[in-house]
Amino acid sequence: MSYRLTNPRIISTLGACSMLIVGLGFPAEGATTPSSTTKSSGSSVPGGSTPGSGNGSSITPNQCTYRSVNITGAKKTQGLPGQYTSGYSKKQNKLYVSSAESGAAESTNISTLARVNPETLQIEATAKIPVVPDTENKTPNLKQFRAPLGITVDDEHDLIWVTDGLTYSVSAYDINTLQQVWTSYDPNKKRNQQTIQHPREIKIDPVTGKLFVTGTGMYSIDPKTKEIKSLDYPKGVYDSFGMHTALNSADRELYVTDWGTDEVLVFDADTFTHKRSLKVTGAEQTGVPTQPHGIAYDNSLGKLYISVQGSNGINSGIYELDKNTGHVKDYVKHGYLSGALAHDEERDLLYIADYGESKQISKDAGNVAVFDTRQNKVVKDVRVSPSEVNFLTIQGDGSVVAVSRDKTYKNTNVDFRIDPTTGEYQSASVDEYPGKESVNITANTLSRFKAEDAGTAPGETKRIIDPASAPEQTRLVSDNTSEAATVSAPKTVYAGQKFTIGGSDWTYGEDYLPSDITVTLDDGKSKVNGQGEMTFKLSEEETSFTRDIEVPADWKPGEEHNVTISSGKTKGDKQRSLTIKFKVEEYNPKYIDSCTVPAQDAVQATEVPFAGYPKVGDNAS
């Protein structure tokens, strides 16, 4: 069922403006609800579940088991200011971490590329990064770093390839000296004129050796000729922003998550032509943005996985998608903002981090989930930092390194900083920038752990609503135009239950201020707790939301009723109004047994002493 509001508006970059009214059933007393009603035969509760078949089906204790892992060597320590990503060299048995900190201004004047001991996490060397004019700043003659963000290690050629999201370039560093040996950066061009726009991730195709770079669009680089090609990105894509890639070796397909369009784009890895786009629909709320982030393709199992950030905690989690249609085959809720993802294909394990946000309360923030791809279950959580885990890397021994941006370590003194007025290196614990307020330099958490197989363990059998018979939560209705405000709704609500109002980007004005949402039932004639009209005030951070509303007690099966959703009561707000009719039906769900992973506390990483930073440019060989 699809509707369009009478007054269209411009969509913000975070997602399509939408409003949802969704049917939400609640179970009988003593039963357990799934965390979503995605039409999946697999897991649908936190941690993953394996449902039985048919109404009243039972699972024996011998059938209800899950893969058990032990977490060893979980440690954390002080890392780098502004650290972003990392890469592992099997040949060198070393970890490399990028750092790009804006500090007191938008330009970067704190930056390095660090070599790190993969076991102790001791920082062994920090590189001197090239300094260039800050052409984007209005103040003349200022300097900035060409700061590393994305990293991939090229052991065959003893190189570290890095992306720079500030000068929009890709560079190669000698892995032994940590000195730049090539760059795509053209000093005669401004940032928006560079060949590669907004580069982020960089990866090597193990078959051809060519490099894939995500950004605003998609690019390939021939490491021998240094030729840069733009992949056949879909024309007219709105707010595209490529994030991460995965390669299907058998089909030679490259999968790319696009955070801006809520899609996974599929390219021919050899011809670079666009083959299809997979729309990623929210497993909890279809009208709320999914914002796909990490991605992995398990070639041995033939499974395509993505991590989804969602919006304000909605839709966040681990998705298994049909590689041809994008249909959500399975969904496991995890965290407030699922982001960084690493894939150990040999062991059939995924590692997914909850980025969380320092301003938001999320019990899983800073957690990394250990996810078994054989059963689609989260089998363990490891808390590696207070929040904002940005990147995960699997090392040669199977251990996982987590790079966070949590700013835990205050008043950090570094010598990989430049004076922006001179471009000269200068040791400091306070960052200063002309015309800006000075800020203390803070460092982030660097952590490591290893998940070791420990056989199987008994799970817990719970009664859940059969996902196949549960009320459908939403109906996708967006027509994907840049100015259309759309609404989705169920055709039915259920007597004695609740329905959920959800939405995304209900804002007004150039500053995208949050609207106040007003809901009335039967033009105010039907009441809930004596109220015929309900107004929801959204916070500034609440770009997406859900609100539960009880079905009025006098609504009986077989009747038709309506709900009106509107905004515009706040001064300056845009006036929008829509009335939706639906039927009331009796709620009679089916229940099945489900095998779940027992609740368990996250393993805590232990703090280890920080060994300090070596002098910048030393110990690089």
Report the location of each language-model feature.
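Secretory targeting and sorting signals
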Residues: 1-32, 621
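Predominantly soluble domains enriched in secretory-pathway, periplasmic, or organellar proteins
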Residues: 31-477, 597, 617
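Short beta-strand segments of immunoglobulin-like
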Residues: 488-493
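Aromatic/hydrophobic beta-strand junction motif of beta-rich domains
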Residues: 501-505, 620
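Aromatic sugar-binding surface patches on proteins
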Residues: 539-548
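Short, surface-exposed loop/turn segments at beta-strand-coil junctions that are enriched for proline
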Residues: 550-556
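Exposed beta-strand face motif in extracellular beta-rich ectodomains
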Residues: 557-563
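Extracellular Ser/Thr-rich, low-complexity/disordered mucin-like segments
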Residues: 603-621
